[in-house]
Amino acid sequence: MVTQALLPSGLVASAVVAASSANLGPGFDSVGLALSLYDEIIVETTDSGLTVTVDGEGGDQVPLGPEHLVVRAVQHGLQAAGVSAAGLAVRCRNAIPHSRGLGSSAAAVVGGLAAVNGLVVQTDSSPSSDAELIQLASEFEGHPDNAAAAVLGGAVVSWTDHSGDRPNYSAVSLRLHPDIRLFTAIPEQRSSTAETRVLLPAQVSHDDARFNVSRAALLVVALTERPDLLMAATEDLLHQPQRAAAMTASAEYLRLLRRHNVAAALSGAGPSLIALSTDSELPTDAVEFGAAKGFAVTELTVGEAVRWSPTVRVPG
């Protein structure tokens, strides 16, 4: 039995982690894009017990005990580092909306794991690398698109290797074309990935698979070199049409944006939308339609890589 080193109490670390949009149309479970909405996580080792406080988004929806996703991620990271803590105090300051398809769960996991880096560097342990953070976080998520975007920032292409004893998750960064501007449309409606994933068929036709493969390949070119191809590159047949019935307002808004030649897609599993454009603003009537339907339409920028740091504890 391996004995884990016990971290001293009073260590404090913090992490700042971005929201993310997955899929971008055809890149199902593979393409991700970090967005400039950030959660902050502060973790302190204590003598015993567990306290969890959450300010901001999701504060009244998440558990405040060991089942909290950040706590689970911290414990997972501590175990991976070969250390443990007698007690923990965890504080979350959330700006990323929950259950909207903006990577809030991936941000919680990546933020918790990154905060562990800030703890262990104050001892003789080594922090996890970006590749290790992606692996650890994706083990929670089951797919690396949001997790990789949260770790690396910017746009990513990720993949899963199932040839070994357990899935191995990897990702590479893309240099987003500087002319591309990002807009999100966030509704009041909530949705969970688990609920909408069951709407997807177990098998798809060869024609639909071929269509999405071509569009996903084109998406990489459009994101990096040819933003004029974004409309074609964000087409999808494998998940958005199947999810439309569960989020009719989002599906209607998506159709309207695309009729206005805006390269829009469901953000992850929805119900939020992500729009990529080389114009400085969305068409006025499209914005007005979204507002009338309860969508908060906002321009964002590309999110940065997760940042973590050891923090000096301030008494009092």
From Swiss-Prot:
Catalysed reactions listed for this entry: L-homoserine + ATP = O-phospho-L-homoserine + ADP + H(+)
Subcellular location: Cytoplasm
Listed EC numbers: 2.7.1.39
Pathway annotation from the record: Amino-acid biosynthesis; L-threonine biosynthesis; L-threonine from L-aspartate: step 4/5
Job of this protein: Catalyzes the ATP-dependent phosphorylation of L-homoserine to L-homoserine phosphate.
Name of the gene encoding the protein in the UniProt record: thrB
Keyword Hydrolase found: no
Name by which UniProt lists this protein: Homoserine kinase
Residues annotated for ATP binding in this entry: P97, H98, S99, R100, G101, L102, G103, S104, S105, A106, A107
Gene3D superfamilies attached to this UniProt entry: 3.30.230.10, GHMP kinase, C-terminal domain
Record's GO cellular component terms: cytoplasm
